[in-house]
């Protein structure tokens, strides 16, 4: 199974260095980094990387997460033979055994997965939590504010969800290719 990491970065060079170290150690088949017009030395550092399988896409402007992920997705879909694409930002650090854990999942029934995104203290990042159902009424929105766990999947099992965030998403490259236009880069952060 060929897995590509798609990392979007903007002006967080030290975090990107850590993310890259951990991404390389995790053993991805290839890595695509979209540099969103960073001005902090990122472009220069990226040009010094010599590991095989790393592709750098330097943009002149910051297109935000959505724009960066769209550019990276377009590149991967037209230049890669990856089976799966793992999406994350420069401040996300994949666990060393992420690919081993992913290989144990039954990928025949699902084409998109969402990783559990945690902060450095091991707490779930609320902005990256998928919804098992999206609040659709005023009552459900208030209920979500009081009891968000009722709208979030269990952490220890595969569960159907209605939403995913870019950070932590794992998607079949063929599905990604069929849905490139669904990445709305004008939203900057989310699609």
Kindly label every feature range from the protein language model:
Residues 2-7, 22-23, 29-34:
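Hydrophobic targeting segments
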Residues 12-25:
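Short, well-formed alpha-helical segments that are part of the catalytic scaffolds
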Residues 35-44, 61, 92-93:
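A conserved acidic beta->alpha catalytic loop
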Residues 59-76:
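Glycine-rich, basic loop-to-helix element that forms the pyrophosphate-binding segment
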Residues 81-91:
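Short beta-strand-to-loop acidic/aromatic patch adjacent to the donor-nucleotide binding site
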Residues 97-128:
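Conserved donor NDP-sugar-binding/catalytic core segment of glycosyltransferases
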Residues 151-171:
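A recurrent flexible, glycine/aromatic-enriched loop bordering the glycosyltransferase active site
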Residues 161-164, 168, 177-191:
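Donor nucleotide-sugar recognition loop
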């Amino acid at each position: 199974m060929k897995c590509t990491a798609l990392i979007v970065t903007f002006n967080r060079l030290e975090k990107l260095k850590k993310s890259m170290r951990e991404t390389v150690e995790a053993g991805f088949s290839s890595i695509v980094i979209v540099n969103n017009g960073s001005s902090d030395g990122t472009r220069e550092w990226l040009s010094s990387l010599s590991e095989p399988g790393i592709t750098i896409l330097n943009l002149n402007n910051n297109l935000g997460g959505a724009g960066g992920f769209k550019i990276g997705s377009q590149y991967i879909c037209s230049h890669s033979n990856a089976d799966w694409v793992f999406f994350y930002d420069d401040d996300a650090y994949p666990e060393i055994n992420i690919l081993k854990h992913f290989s144990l999942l039954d990928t025949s029934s699902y084409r998109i997965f969402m990783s559990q995104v945690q902060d450095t203290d091991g707490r779930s990042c609320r902005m990256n939590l998928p919804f098992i159902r999206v609040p659709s009424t005023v009552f459900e929105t208030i209920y979500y504010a009081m009891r968000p766990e009722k709208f979030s999947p269990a952490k220890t099992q595969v569960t159907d969800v209605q939403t995913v965030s870019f950070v932590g998403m794992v998607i079949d490259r063929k599905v990604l290719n069929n849905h490139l236009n669904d990445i709305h880069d004008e939203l900057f952060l989310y699609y």
